[in-house]
Amino acid sequence: MHTAEILETLASGGVLPPETAHMAFDRLMSGEMTPAQAGSFLMGLRSHGETPELVASAVRAALAHARLIQGLEYDRIDIVGTGGDGRNSFNCSTAAALTLAGMGYKVVKHGNRAVSSTSGSADVVEGLGLPLETAPEDVPVLLARHNFVFLFAPFYHPAFRHVMPVRRDLGIRTLFNVLGPLLNPARPTRMLLGVAKPAMLHTMADALLLTGVRRAAVVHGAGGYDELTTMGPARVVMVRDGATEEMEINPADHGFAPCTPAQLEVHDRQEALEVMRLLLAGEGPAPMLDMMAFNAGLAVYLMEDSMPISAAMARARQAVAGGAGGKVLDA
């Protein structure tokens, strides 16, 4: 099918079959579309709506152009959010990921520099002295040694150079705003994925099912965050055994005290880094430590098929208090 026919289908409100969507995304990633075609395609997708099938087609096409990591035959997890929650909170996903690695779990953290937040995961990781651009063949060695590796999105997805100028010129939200968390080149078998909009909970969960993740939780935190917070109960869609199930996780059930948005904020990159160093040592503001443990606890639950969530939360609280994340930096 010619690109013009694909654009006509979208313009007339038609639905792209998965194989056609994959073909179109492949052309976009390979630079075969002109800037005008690429912009029209992204606008058409926005009008079409982000279905799980469309998201999964985009993921498969993007990964086909990525620098994939081979040789990982064990369970591994990513803790990541879509961003876009408009909160200048500390980088909880990175703190929880490093804590998990300090507990002995294999963590493949895929991320980028800040877009809508004060400090992105790449900014924090770089500030902590960890490498950003790790060659794919070196990842298994680093994972075996440290249980943690950071995968810098621009390095692993060179094909995105064809998409970024168009996204920048459009200046509006597109499908690519939610794709990032699903494009981990290490293809994690487990995932804790946060979404800023509750309407995306089931879309992302169903997309994870279609892309083969074994066990995952898609969460929307109280207060409108793309991660768990201790402000109140979180909406969660679990992905396991080939199906999805919506549930609620209440921080009060696990002994976490409520907090306010102001208690989770950082105001610039320097503060974000200073706070991160404290948290990884088991020090710093109690509300941030609690949020760290809450997210790490759910991640432990995802990694342990037979552990009750209460036990997973207790283990994570103990690890956070003991500075497990900081030990990864010292290894």
UniProtKB/Swiss-Prot annotation:
Record-listed Mg(2+) 1 binding positions: S93, E227
Name of the protein in question: Anthranilate phosphoribosyltransferase
NCBIfam families associated with the record: trpD
Sites where the protein binds Mg(2+) 2: D226, E227
Cellular component GO terms, alphabetical: cytosol
Origin organism lineage: Bacteria, Pseudomonadati, Thermodesulfobacteriota, Desulfovibrionia, Desulfovibrionales
Binding sites annotated in the UniProt record for anthranilate 2: R167
Keyword Ligase in annotation: no
PANTHER family: ANTHRANILATE PHOSPHORIBOSYLTRANSFERASE (PTHR43285:SF2)
Family per record: Belongs to the anthranilate phosphoribosyltransferase family.
Domain of life: Bacteria
Listed GO MF terms: anthranilate phosphoribosyltransferase activity; magnesium ion binding
Pathway it works in: Amino-acid biosynthesis; L-tryptophan biosynthesis; L-tryptophan from chorismate: step 2/5
Gene name per UniProt: trpD
Binding-site list for anthranilate 1: G81, N112
Keywords linked to the UniProt accession: Amino-acid biosynthesis, Aromatic amino acid biosynthesis, Glycosyltransferase, Magnesium, Metal-binding, Transferase, Tryptophan biosynthesis
Record-level GO BP terms: L-tryptophan biosynthetic process
Necessary cofactors: Mg(2+)
Record-annotated disulphide pairs: none
Top-tier EC class: transferase
Cofactor-binding details, from the entry: Binds 2 magnesium ions per monomer.
Chemical reaction(s) catalysed: N-(5-phospho-beta-D-ribosyl)anthranilate + diphosphate = 5-phospho-alpha-D-ribose 1-diphosphate + anthranilate
Subunit and partners: Homodimer.
Catalytic activity, EC: 2.4.2.18
Physiological role: Catalyzes the transfer of the phosphoribosyl group of 5-phosphorylribose-1-pyrophosphate (PRPP) to anthranilate to yield N-(5'-phosphoribosyl)-anthranilate (PRA).
Residues annotated as binding 5-phospho-alpha-D-ribose 1-diphosphate: 81, 84-85, 89, 91-94, 109-117, 121
